[in-house]
Amino acid sequence: GVSSAAVSRYLNGGPLSEQKRAVIHEVVEKTGYRPDTAAQTLRTGKVNQVGVIAPSIGSQSVGQITAGIASELDAKSYLMLLGNTELDAQRELGYLTAMQRNHVAGIILLGSYYTPQLAQALKNCRVPVVVTGQRFQDVACVYNDDRTAARELAQRMLDHGRKRIVYIGGTERDDATGVQRREGVQDALNAAGLNGEQMPRICCNAFTMEEGQRCMQELLVRCPDLDGVVCVTDTVAFGAMRALREAGRHVGQDVGLAGVGDSWAGSMMEPGLATVRFYQKQVGQEAARILLQMLEENGS
């Protein structure tokens, strides 16, 4: 047998020999026992809940990031409280306030628009915060190199002889997808002796197939001789592909098409979509590890 103190250490992640840990683990699994988290909080003063604020839970990348976060939190017996903003800035601010009132130990904020109001709200947070997908000032961040990714996509097109490249981007309120990806494409064009700043481009209102199709139709009118299209996301590229086919253009032959995200659907299309992969699950895992380290250092 083992003592009640040993069981308590096991349930709370305390020091314990591997032999005792294995014995207790077997009993816990057989009985299906789960500790009362509210009682644990009252007894230890330690909050075991982390808030996660996401811009759109229907997004493939958001799903991958939250899966990574959950895997790390589960390993440390933390629960995840999820808030879905649907890109509503006021709802995002509301979640930041509400989660603190609900006594979360920390918050992970998935990339959003950086506004003075959000900057002030993050500054006023009473709990540790980690941001993913964006580079915000004065807060821990985990983000991808969007500029390099877009530059490499455009360079691939240039290497295949494309010279009249257009770009379907996103709102520049979003630095990562709106500014960094657009600048990456322009970098590649400038390096090739083309004028990146004069590149025909259009901003879609949402990362949807419908918007990709609409933007592509407009660019075909403006630039009928285009031979390459770089899109801000794969989903937007799928819509662009539809518009190109409707216009009688042959994707992969007379016009190149690329997107960002390495969506599973891209591999099923014929021809396949040129894309770049972001390891979003690892982004979520790293964000959770950073937050857990901050909580450990704070004694939370």
How should these model regions be labeled?
Residues 1-48:
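N-terminal helix-turn-helix DNA-binding module of bacterial transcription factors
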Residues 4-9, 43-58, 156, 164-171:
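Short beta-strand segments enriched in small/hydrophobic residues
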Residues 16, 61-62, 91, 176-177, ...:
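Secondary-structure boundary/capping motif
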Residues 19, 37, 63-65, 94, ...:
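Generic recognition of short, well-ordered alpha-helical segments
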Residues 22, 37, 45-155, 159, ...:
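Alpha-helical recognition/docking segments in bacterial nutrient-uptake
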Residues 30, 71-76, 100, 124-131, ...:
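Bacterial carbohydrate/catabolite-sensing allosteric modules
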Residues 30-36, 90, 110-112, 213, ...:
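Short gly/ser/thr-rich secondary-structure transition/capping motifs
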